[in-house]
């Protein structure tokens, strides 16, 4: 089963600095008609789940309490049941609204000897998930609006910060329709709070993947980027309770060194929706750009750290007024 999922606000948007003319956009989880996984940037790239455990923990510190397994015998069953759970989520997802509080951070350093420039803001918006269904497909779109109902993202971008979204849809990598596009490995078991979880690593496969993170610059030419990551899956019900994604490889051609997203999902029971929905409760995003290539005459680093918190999920209904 495949669902088209995209962010109407262009997913991730960012500017190099406040007032800068450079504006890029990343759209997460957009299904393309052509294969998104151009293998050229990923030649000789190996997923980090293939690294020895000590090296993997350095990359993903959340795995420090992992109890590794030696066999992959349970992987097929875990993927099957998790995929069915993800499919069920997309079948039941409906129009939703929530309150979103975001902490925005930007750190810029122009030269190795210069002092880093740190800036930040806290903002609040209305977060919408809207489902548009037709006979043959179902599109799930995210929006953000301010108190006046206007597009929220443009205001933040003009201030030089990055706006990040797409988190409610990120479990799509594990849906039954998209699992063939990735490689998976059962890493072991780990306790997350009171939950015992299966820990599964995944990596999109170049040449097969159609889900992608897409960056678009001033030239208008989009850059397709693939991801790898780790999912923590509740052993009782095969629900993904935490998901981390990283770039499959840095994209030096566009100056993108790192993009890490960590999503924690929480159970939401709406009064008029029979099945509970597992939706983002908190998200951390780190995006890092650099032009440093070993030559001290060319050095520029820019990083963003956003933290999102979601609360008060409700059914979204459009009010109509009949005018005589």
Named regions from a protein language model:
Residues 1-11:
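N-terminal secretory signal peptides that target proteins for export/translocation
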Residues 2-3, 24, 33:
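Long, intrinsically disordered, low-complexity accessory segments associated with secretion
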Residues 9-10, 17-19, 71, 183:
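Hydrophobic alpha-helical segments and their boundary regions
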Residues 13-27:
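Bacterial N-terminal signal peptides
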Residues 32-228, 235-241, 246-260, 264-324:
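Structured extracytoplasmic
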């Amino acid at each position: 089963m495949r669902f088209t999922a995209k962010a109407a606000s262009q997913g991730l948007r960012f500017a190099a600095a406040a007032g800068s003319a450079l504006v890029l956009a990343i759209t997460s989880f957009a299904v393309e008609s052509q294969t998104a996984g151009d293998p050229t940037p990923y030649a000789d790239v190996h997923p980090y789940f293939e690294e020895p455990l000590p090296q993997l923990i350095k990359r993903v510190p959340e795995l420090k309490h992992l109890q590794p397994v030696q066999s992959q015998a349970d992987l097929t069953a875990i993927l099957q049941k998790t995929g069915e759970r993800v499919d069920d989520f997309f079948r039941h997802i409906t129009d939703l609204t929530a309150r979103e509080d975001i902490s925005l951070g930007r750190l810029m350093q122009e030269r190795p000897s210069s002092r880093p420039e740190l800036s930040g803001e806290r903002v609040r918006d209305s977060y919408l998930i809207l489902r548009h269904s037709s006979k043959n497909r179902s599109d799930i779109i995210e929006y953000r609006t301010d108190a006046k109902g206007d597009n929220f993202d443009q205001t933040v971008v003009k201030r030089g910060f990055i706006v990040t979204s797409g988190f409610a849809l990120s479990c799509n990598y594990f849906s039954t329709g998209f699992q063939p596009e990735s490689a998976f490995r059962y890493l072991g078991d780990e306790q997350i709070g009171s939950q015992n979880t299966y820990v599964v690593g995944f990596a999109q496969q170049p040449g097969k993947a159609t889900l992608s993170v897409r960056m678009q610059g001033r030239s208008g030419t989009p850059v397709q980027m693939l991801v790898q990551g780790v999912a923590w899956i509740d052993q009782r019900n095969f629900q993904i309770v935490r998901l981390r994604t990283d770039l499959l490889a840095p994209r030096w051609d566009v100056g993108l060194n790192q993009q890490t997203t960590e999503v924690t999902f929480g159970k939401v029971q709406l009064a008029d929706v029979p099945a509970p929905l597992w939706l983002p409760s908190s998200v951390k995003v780190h995006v890092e750009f650099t032009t440093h290539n070993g030559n001290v005459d060319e050095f520029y680093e820019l990083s963003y750290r956003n933290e999102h918190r979601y609360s008060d999920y409700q059914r979204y209904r459009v009010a109509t007024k009949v005018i005589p």
